[in-house]
A protein has these predicted regions:
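Soluble non-transmembrane domains of integral membrane proteins
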Residues: 1-182
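Interfacial loop/helix-cap signal at membrane boundaries in integral membrane proteins
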Residues: 164-213, 305-319
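Core alpha-helical transmembrane segments of integral membrane proteins
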Residues: 185-244, 250, 280-284, 288
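Transmembrane helix interruption/hinge and helix-loop junction motifs
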Residues: 208-209, 362-371
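Transmembrane alpha-helical segments and their cytosolic interface motifs
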Residues: 213, 265-293
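Lipid-exposed faces of alpha-helical membrane segments in multi-pass integral membrane proteins
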Residues: 216-220, 224, 284, 322, ...
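Single conserved hydrophobic/aromatic residue that forms the stacking wall/gate
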Residues: 377-387
Length: 387
């Protein structure tokens, strides 16, 4: 057929080795091999396959080495075998020590940003998985060698295995192997990242917009964190009410910081206020921010996904820097409304005032989808602080 090709190798001793390569759906490739023993003695054969590539990482798109998603995404081999569902081994690791392990089933992959190529040996056979550096050209290879099979004279043996070469779409990977979807690596916060993507994907299936999916997931995260955030916002309100009394203590004790601190702590205890709770909303958001970042740089579905007007790709920076400016303005407004704890060092206070600018410049080169999430978080904060 037009989607398959067969290669036949005829050996001088009368043996033949044929391989049929067929293109399946969802970037699947099927391999069917047959070996006929034309000799007069029994022979042993071991099916094998491997993937070669260099260790060079190409960074493309807008941004630099620190903010371009492809610069942070993992590039290198990964394996799945008995006792280990997902094992990343960097090029430097397998250069130092060749990787070898025996398993039944499993898979091997070469992973890069958004894409991967995987080999899946015959899942009913025992195989040796390998990863090493090739001395002849400096490239790296990962492969498998299945268990040796004996072929009697005048008989043949068949074997099948498969491969995947395409984008890291979880649905496709799960169809290939139950554990291949782990190649979409959300880092150590995968237990947050995976549910975030699941909800985003569910919303996108309903409304066909990844941008609005980010907006709605942000709202859901805010609702989820609201009980704890409410405690912090209520505490901030009490802190604002205490500002006149705190200023009075500052004027009364002047340079006697020890006495002033003692009286402030007594006042906080009396009024049941905890100044440290002012950091709680930011601390609660931190793991979700990091998980969101990894979801955005790992999710191929967001590649070239537009949102509104000028945002043509949520996976790269905002080309007009409008979202970073909105984020900067929201951070500055939140800073104005949030009460500053009494007794703060003047130098620290001045540095704190520049934080919106520092973070605004930093996030200007991060993916637009991430800055959209941050902007929504920061825009919602001043409203709550006012209440």
């Amino acid at each position: 057929s037009k989607d398959s090709v067969e290669i036949i190798r005829r050996l001088p001793n009368g043996s033949t080795h044929s391989k049929k390569i067929s293109l399946g759906e969802n970037f699947r490739i099927n391999f069917e091999e047959e070996f006929f023993n034309g000799e007069v003695v029994e022979v042993s054969v071991a099916p094998y396959a491997k993937i070669n590539r260099s260790s060079e990482k190409t960074i493309s798109g807008s941004g630099g080495i620190f903010t371009q998603p492809s610069s942070w995404a993992y590039l290198g081999p990964a394996f799945s075998y008995d006792g280990e569902n997902y094992d990343k081994r960097s090029f430097s690791e397998i250069e130092e020590v060749e990787f070898r392990t025996s398993t039944s089933g499993g898979w091997i992959s070469m992973i890069q940003h958004y894409f991967l190529t995987s080999l899946l040996p015959n899942q009913s056979s025992n195989s040796l998985l390998q990863g090493k550096k090739n001395k002849n050209d400096g490239s790296f290879s990962v492969g498998f060698v299945e268990e040796t099979k004996k072929v009697a004279p005048g008989t043949s043996i068949k074997n099948e295995y498969s491969a995947y070469s395409g984008p890291k779409i979880k649905g496709n990977l799960d169809l290939m192997h139950p554990k291949l979807g782990l190649a979409i690596d959300y880092g150590f916060l995968y237990w947050i990242g995976q549910p975030i993507f699941w909800v985003m994907n569910l919303i996108n299936q309903a409304i066909s917009s990844w941008g609005w999916s980010i907006v709605l997931v942000t709202v859901l995260i805010k609702i989820f964190l609201w009980p704890l955030s409410y405690v912090a916002y209520k505490n901030m309100g009490k802190m604002r009410q205490l500002q006149p009394k705190l200023k009075e203590l500052q004027e009364r004790y002047g340079d006697d910081r020890q006495a002033m601190s003692r009286e402030m702590m007594a006042l906080y205890s009396k009024e049941k206020v905890n100044p440290a709770l002012g950091c709680l909303p930011m601390l609660l958001q931190m793991p979700f921010f990091l998980a969101f970042y990894w979801v955005l740089i790992e999710t191929v579905e967001l590649r070239h996904a537009p949102f509104m007007f000028w945002i043509v790709d949520l996976s790269v920076r905002d080309p007009l820097f409008i979202l970073p400016l909105l984020n900067m303005g929201a951070m500055y407004l939140m800073q104005l409304l949030q009460p500053q704890p009494a007794g703060v060092d003047p130098m620290q206070a001045r540095i704190f005032k520049f934080m919106p600018i520092i973070f605004g410049v930093l996030f200007a080169f991060f993916p637009a989808g991430l800055v959209l999430y941050l902007s929504l978080i920061h825009i919602s904060e001043p409203t709550r602080l006012e209440r």
